Amino acid sequence: MNILNLKIIMFLLISNIIVVGGAWATSTCPDWPATRIAVEINALEQQLNKWSAAYHQQGHSPVTDDIYDQLQDKLRVWQSCRGLPDKTESQPIPGKGQFLHPVAHTGLKKLKDETALTRWMAGRKNLWVQPKVDGVAVTLVYHGGKLVQLLSRGNGVKGQNWTEKAPFISAIPQYIANAPALLTLQGELFLLMDGHQQAKSGGVNARSTVAGALMRKSPSPLLAQVGVFIWAWPDGPTTMKEKVALLQVMGFPFTAKYSEPVMSHLDVVQWRQFWFQAPLPFVTDGVVVRQEEEPAGRYWQATPGQWSMAWKYPPLQHIAEVKDIHFTLGRTGKGTVVLEVLPIKIDDKWIRRVNIGSVTRWKQWDIAPGDHITLALAGHGIPRLDNVVWRVHQRNTITAPNWDKFHQLSCFQRLPHGCEPQFLSRLIWLSGPGGLDIGGIGGGFWQELIHHELINDLVGWLLLTPEQIASIPGIGNARAEKIYQQFQRAKQQPFSRWLLALGFPQVVSVDAQWQVVLRRSLSEWATMAGIGQMRAKQIKHFLDHPDVQALADFLSTQKVVGFELTE
């Protein structure tokens, strides 16, 4: 048995375990030479910087926030593997904005989970929670109550001038009576929604819609549907109560309506869950927890501050890293490609393997070990490949096996050479629910029989004695006797189940004797309900195949139901 066949067979033994429960570490260091990991870190870092620049300068990114955040986490892991410092939060954002912000935009550091939230809140007081509105960050500048600048965030220090768009955004007051002589506000321009429920509808591309309207040269009618959520008032009132009250008076009502005091992490958890489910006038992607005490505006920098933190909602898209690629040969001779991924939890299921279909489809995806893919759960919790979001710089060439000689009527025996994978798949099907449904008998048991040369064809197990079964390591006499009795009882299974177990290409029940089935002509099969000409040809090819007839002759000697010779 060659190495490739052994790899395929061993994978078949566990390929039915698609999702498993239990904790598993996913943040592991790749088994790469130091030179390669340095190259991969540099490549991923550059790509993240490009996406970040697009996000902050143009209001949209080729990837979602979920994908960006998860790849940023991966970069941190790789950097820690090399002993490099985490620069992801302090990295300046490249930008071409020409207009200086009176106060820099600090951005937000993201909390990973409830434990991180609890740790950050410890020792802090006067904390508030707000929805993290998903929109376009801006600065509003008022002189003597008059709006004089509307600036995009840009790189946090300089942004683009969108002031000419402000009159078309009714949510932005053009003049504020009794405002401070110099008023600088930072907030989010968002698409006004009617009862948007984040848990049900997700992001609906709202931020990109707003960004597109702002970036257009001529005013867009969409600007009338834009709201504003003020989340920072540098050098403003010292208490949040006073701050939100004054903002409401000045014409910014959303901040007061969606700011809540919190005493513990449990309060944050409750508000986060509530806003995730509740109908809201904007799209959100998490919550922001902030403390009242802030440094003076002159100390703010274009890096995340320590007085506010974001705790995002669970990602809608999940990234998995491809660990290996397996090629499996099914019982009908069709090859499939299964990606082995570093374990990832989606909902309540841990995903370790993803079937992506044929070799042709795998080649179209161009997936190699180390690539990062997005996964979702399809029907019955089966993982589905959605996209490839990051390809490693160094791509190892993988050659798929040549399966041209395998088909629906090949490998009813262990030999000739190369048949082991398909033969094993046939045995797994035979004992499974689609065949004879022999409880407790699966791929592992069949592989042991093959390994110890106790079985050479699809029905040879009927000749095994309890002593032969007990000779397999790990199977004692009691279990061997039980298996033997199961095998003997299988002889009394209905004839239709035996046909399906052998691979009979028929989806409807067949209730007859083997000799009767064998004598039916092609035209007789074709006229039967649910069959047709194509399926009839498949049936005749199956029945006339010498290997199948040899199996039927053997089953006749074993007095299996339906195969007995009749006079």
Curated annotation (Swiss-Prot):
Catalytic reaction(s) noted: NAD(+) + (deoxyribonucleotide)n-3'-hydroxyl + 5'-phospho-(deoxyribonucleotide)m = (deoxyribonucleotide)n+m + AMP + beta-nicotinamide D-nucleotide
Highest taxon above the source species: Bacteria
Keyword Cytoplasm: no
GO terms classed as biological process: DNA repair; DNA replication
Keyword terms of this UniProt record: DNA damage, DNA repair, DNA replication, Ligase, NAD
Enzyme class: ligase
InterPro entries referenced in this protein's UniProt entry, alphabetically: DNA_ligase_B, DNAligase_adenylation, DNAligase_N, NA-bd_OB-fold, NAD_dep_DNA_ligaseB, NAD_DNA_ligase_OB, RuvA_2-like
CDD domains: LIGANc
Spans traversing the lipid bilayer: none
Functional description taken from the UniProt entry: Catalyzes the formation of phosphodiester linkages between 5'-phosphoryl and 3'-hydroxyl groups in double-stranded DNA using NAD as a coenzyme and as the energy source for the reaction.
Family per similarity comment: Belongs to the NAD-dependent DNA ligase family. LigB subfamily.
NCBIfam families (UniProt xref): PRK08097.1
UniProt protein name: DNA ligase B
